[in-house]
Amino acid sequence: MTLGAKTAVTRFSFTTGHTPERGTAARRVVTRGTAAALILLLSLTGCDIETNTGSGTGAGAGTPGSGQGTGGGAALAAVDALAVKGRAPKTGYDRDQFGSPWADTDSNGCDTRDDILKRDLKDVRLKSDHCSVLSGSLSPDPYTDKTVAYYRGRSQVDIDHLVALSDAWQKGAQQWDASKRIALANDPLNLLAVDAGPNRSKGDGDTATWLPANKAFRCTYVARQVAVKKKYGLWVTSAEKSAMSKVLSTCPNQPLPSGGNPTSAPKRFHAG
């Protein structure tokens, strides 16, 4: 059972305007007693007071469901566990091999793109379907440390695959079944709302060929890539591994993110 924010605020509101002095003490006792009784009732029944600020949790958040928990150990140590091989040919790569874009693989009724926008943007405004994000603010953008406004249909905000799908294809994903490829394409651990410009200049670059201009975010960025490659069993090139180690050696205590979705999508999803 959940009490909505509107109900909770109403029950805990106090009058701030001037009131006659007579009877004030008695009213305060009653009001405080009512609030205390309500709190006791909630603790006994297991109810939650649900609050909604109308904003996302931000790109660096490690909240439940964000795909950004930190229970996986040190990121630098995890680099050594990644297999090292050469980049395979890009032959046969097609975005359709990873399923239709933004499939609802977590079955929450909203597509993956809107899930990530709700997670990473602030001041989020939704349509009446409670899924479609109409507007919000990427504040700050993790790649540039600037604020980028989001408006549905004409936005400068992209959802980046931290490990690009083409890069994944050339480093193991071409050997997977469709279910695993669809899972990677929609895993919150591998997705981030970012400024469209830097994202498009990144292309399918790996750590050896592209890093965000915002140096303060580089450790987090590389740790996320390491976490995704470890989770899905993707390999790295020698140059990529060296670049990962170089970045993470500047932040040896950087945690390895964990969480996200399962590594196989529900059977109802198909890929070309």
Task: Locate the predicted segments by residue.
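Domain-level detector of nuclease and nuclease-like folds
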Residues: 142-272
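Cell wall/extracellular polymer interaction/catalysis modules
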Residues: 63-142, 146, 153-154, 167
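Bacterial N-terminal signal peptides that target proteins for export
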Residues: 4-34
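Hydrophobic helical h-region of N-terminal Sec-dependent signal peptides
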Residues: 35-40
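C-terminal motif of bacterial Sec signal peptides marking the signal peptidase cleavage site
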Residues: 43-46
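Composition-driven, intrinsically disordered low-complexity tracts enriched in small residues
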Residues: 54-64, 83, 261-272
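Bacterial signal peptide processing site
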Residues: 48-51
